[in-house]
């Protein structure tokens, strides 16, 4: 995995930890272990790596050792789309756009686990099943 992909994956996963991100550890053969909730993240100085704790396995994993499960924009319900648009108000004066509360709208997408960074098409995340985040 390229360094920029690792960094993007780490940043994305950090933003979703408070909202119960589901991940699967990647086995050495490339297959995935069962999906579990991510517990927390941290930094371990001796290894100089950022890591995530998967409570069920009682182990620490780096971002490139985990595969998050995310929803696509197409998976969003009408209510979720309306809520997203409500949080991301746009004023257009003909030449410029002014976005209000963009951080709030990104937090909302993190909370409902929508892949707005293109991780699924780039093979960095798996598509979540409908039941996964209920």
Give the role of each language-model region:
Residues 1-134:
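Structural boundary micro-motifs
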